Amino acid sequence: IDEKKLEAVGEKYGIPPQYRFTDYRDLVNCDIVDAVDICTSNDAHFKVAMAAVEAGKPFNLEKPITLTAEEADILAKAAQEKNVKNMVCFSYRFKAAARYAKDLIAQGKIGRVYHVNMQYFQAWGLPRANCPLVWRYVKSRTGTGALGDLGSHALDLVRFVTNKEYTRVVGHTGTYVHERPLLDGEGVGKVDVDDFSNYMADMEDEISVSFQITRFAYGRGNYQRMEIYGSEGAIVYSLDATPAGIDEIEVCSGDINADAHVFNHLPIPQQYFSDQMQSFADIVNGTGDGLAANIQDGQANQHLLDAIVESAEKGTWLSL
């Protein structure tokens, strides 16, 4: 904790000195704290979340929930045993287009799902962006690079929309920029996590999935595209594909002949719109809609991340 910054922020927002904490445990256990929002670097997720569990306080946890599957198992078990309410920030579950796509698939509108192709592209890792060695490039603090930062979202979104579990994965990861300037400007430091990750997966019901994840996609801010192909139609979910940066959905159905294949943008009914932080408040108050991710979803996701890393190292498929 930078105590000078702590004092400055406290003064700016009128926070009394007794509520300016330098130890997260004191903050979590403070009498006026009703719930805990954990948005630290990844290496602190486990210990802060465990403190919330031990205090019996609801918590909202950023992803990936831990650095390893072992930590995820411990945290998930503890939260379940103490019956502590929680939410994991797989934010794209709250996109109206994703919820609409999920519902269309559940209704059988595109028949049996065969394939899903998922892309998640950003550009801030490119050399010309001049990003220094922030914590997201340091394995001891982040666990993985683009894989955990972006790929965890992609894995969860496909699982959420299809409502199917993964059965095996195979991965490939790589790093383009191996050194970056230190934050203090004094020299450079080693990048020891991935800049990109490509992986394939099989899911229940023989669904075949491919993923392309990178921070080196020139011109992309926070771009996602998920194509879902079924026996009776197809759905395309996209985010940040236009300057408006909104989430959209296109659907193709009807005649099987290729010349009749038209992807139509669908207006999204109001019922699919939701707010992430309101959803956490609803969970705390016992009125959640059941669509937000919980600690068990985060646990499953961490096991997937670990499996993809191991698969990339071994160069082979891994069953889950």
Where are these regions (language model features)?
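C-terminal helix-rich "cap/oligomerization" subdomain common to oxidoreductases
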Residues: K12, A35-I38, D73, E81, ...
